[in-house]
């Protein structure tokens, strides 16, 4: 049950613009570092391993804490958590740009991950509270433009800003956007859930989740260097499995769990969240394809980012189309169509054995299908997850959904990068890129199957 103050307030364009601007602080600005790794190596006078940690740690920490932040948004207020997230982004951005110390770069990126963890579930909950029916679907479309669209633009945006203005301007602009978002959201009535206000926060669950995900991330990113038979690898694997098992047991017994597994009794919510995890995992495509054309074809970072222009254009256009398809066809068909089109695009981008000109053409067309598919999928998937969450748990439900987004992206990039490196060392860079991109296509196929089996034609909105 919501606080009475929200009953007299209806979401407007001012609030929606503020929400979208807060969302792109992560999906556009923070994620844009994927295309400026060599520049950061020179600027901070450090090795690629340190820079890769800084690049990936934002999505990882966002994924680890987003569910807990969703619970805090329900308990203490969604407007409050959104504002805290925006302020954290400003702080993180300042730490990144004020010096050339690698440690401050990593700390700043970590804080940006916490910022995204606060912003994503809180803003989805605000949309659930203050927008109804078609207005909510429209608001979710623009929210998706901020997230999916931001992720589509980030590669080109990062390369362009770094080349034309210098990489620090990425975060200077992020600070400016954050201040505008704070101004636009100011004055919005607070919205929170009364039903869980007296419950204790699940610290044990959060600690176990962090231990599990950090162990798993190290296994993926450093596993080939450690060796599967090494003591450290086996120890980390045991920690990951043990913490996961203990997490499941404790969460099922907890009165106010970090992850409420009762939410997954709804097949539509489960299908939307699982497919969302996998389709965010195909973010590994950008890392692999960008690295391949730079190392294999000799392209610059700006040229590499330019190949994905069709992706960013199509994802921005098709998100609103996905909204219209949602209104006319329901959730399932657009989600299936979008995923199917994405798989076709992924396969085209994987044709690294072709001559350069033919591959570039396939890449441009492939990115077009990639953006087309994600754009169609985005709004129906988000609407399915939010519509199938009870109002008093919408913050937690949104947190789990966006946890799937962040962790899907983090582990998709890690897995794709690991496969690319291992296969390239065993064979050559062309085969390595192709196999890594096939991995991404496989995640798309699995997502298609999950949607087909779990998302009903007519969603039951009661859990």
Curated annotation (Swiss-Prot):
GO terms for molecular function: transmembrane transporter activity. The chain crosses the membrane at residues 17-37, 53-73, 86-106, 107-127, 142-162, 165-185, 201-221, 230-250, 273-293, 299-319, 334-354, 357-377, 403-423, 435-455. GO terms for biological process: response to antibiotic. One of its GO terms (cellular component) is plasma membrane. Its main location: membrane. SUPFAM superfamilies: MFS general substrate transporter (SSF103473). It is found in: Cell membrane. Induction: Transcription is highly induced in abscesses. Up-regulated by MgrA. Down-regulated during stationary-phase. Gene3D superfamilies: MFS general substrate transporter like domains, Multidrug resistance protein D. It is a multi-pass membrane protein. Coiled coil: none annotated. Keywords: Antibiotic resistance, Cell membrane, Membrane, Transmembrane, Transmembrane helix, Transport, Virulence. PANTHER family: MAJOR FACILITATOR SUPERFAMILY MULTIDRUG TRANSPORTER MFSC. Belongs to the major facilitator superfamily. TCR/Tet family. Multidrug efflux pump that acts independently of NorA and is one of the factors that confers resistance against diverse quinolones and chemical compounds. Can facilitate bacterial survival in vivo when overexpressed in an abscess and may contribute to the relative resistance of staphylococcal abscesses to antimicrobial therapy. This is Quinolone resistance protein NorB. It comes from Staphylococcus aureus (strain MW2).
